[in-house]
A protein has these predicted regions:
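N-terminal, active-site-proximal structural segment of metallo-dependent hydrolase catalytic domains
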Residues: 1-48, 64, 204, 219-220
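Active-site-proximal beta-strand elements of phosphoester/diester hydrolases
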Residues: 1-7, 76-78, 95, 104-113
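Active-site metal-binding loops of divalent metal-dependent hydrolases
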Residues: 5, 32, 110-112, 141-143, ...
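Active-site environment of divalent metal-dependent phosphoester hydrolases
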Residues: 8-10, 33-38, 115-117, 143-150, ...
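Active-site neighborhood of phospho(di)ester-bond hydrolases with catalytic His/Asp-centered motifs
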Residues: 27-30, 56-57, 138-142, 162-165
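Structured beta-strand-rich core segments of catalytic domains in phosphoester-bond hydrolases
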Residues: 31-104, 193-198
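Metal-dependent phosphoester-hydrolase catalytic domains
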Residues: 72-79, 85, 131-136, 145-220
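His/acidic metal-ligating clusters that form di-metal
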Residues: 95-100, 106, 120-143, 151-152
Length: 220
């Protein structure tokens, strides 16, 4: 599941309630805690509050984070900031090589810029990092553009498939009009479900300005 939790999850308990209700094995977070000196402890607390284990990310990854359920193994991680113009928000990417049901699976979480030109530079780096991962790979996050945008097309050209539809728009959470949060998959998998995490709409609106995107994936 990918989820932009809004400014470090500042709305508190509703964020945790959304994730616990969705029961993801892997959670990819945008806008996780980033306060200097405190981000690591707060990121771990966030993951634990969701019933998960912090894996990687946080401030060094431009506020992107990976957390996993107890049964998911971690092989390796990589986090980096993406260069931005002076005064622009922090951006970054976090990648993790995981082991799920004895199989290698890669995940990459990103939150792309509001600037269209910057987004293309950033997503190219995302694709480069994702190519280093083995097994099926999930690339997910807030792309800040709709599915007809150039970043989605670049990901699709790199082999990532969008299984979503306009039936699950993600922003703004209270009355979603746009599908700007993506979860794309490459590799030998079957996507059983994509989009709606099955969480009450009022809780989603209380938790964040974005709705999460959940995929149920079978390894084949």
């Amino acid at each position: 599941m990918t989820y932009n939790i809004l400014q470090g999850g500042r709305r508190g308990q509703p964020v945790l309630d959304v994730v616990r209700a969705a029961v993801p094995d892997v959670l990819l977070v945008n806008e996780c805690p980033k306060t200097p000196l405190l981000w690591r402890r707060r990121s771990r607390r966030l993951a634990e509050g969701c019933g998960l284990r912090y894996v990687a990310g946080g401030r060094p990854a431009g506020s992107n984070l990976v957390a996993v359920a107890p049964g998911v193994g971690v092989v390796s991680v990589h986090a980096e900031r993406l260069r931005q113009p002076f005064g622009a928000p922090r951006r970054g990417v976090v990648a993790a090589q995981l082991r799920v049901q004895g199989r290698l699976v890669g995940v990459v979480s990103c939150h792309l810029s509001l600037d269209a030109d910057r987004r293309l530079v950033e997503v190219a780096r995302v694709v480069e990092l994702a190519a280093r991962l083995r097994g099926p790979v999930v690339v997910a996050g807030d792309l800040n553009e709709g599915p007809d945008g150039p970043c989605w097309r670049l990901l699709e050209r790199a082999g990532y498939v969008d299984h979503g539809s306009s039936q699950w728009r993600t922003f703004p959470a209270e009355r979603p009009e746009r599908r700007i949060d993506a979860l794309l998959v490459r590799g030998d998998v079957e996507v059983l479900k994509h989009g709606d995490p099955g969480v009450d709409a009022a809780l989603l609106a209380a938790a964040s300005d974005h709705r999460p995107v959940l995929a149920r994936i079978a390894l084949v």
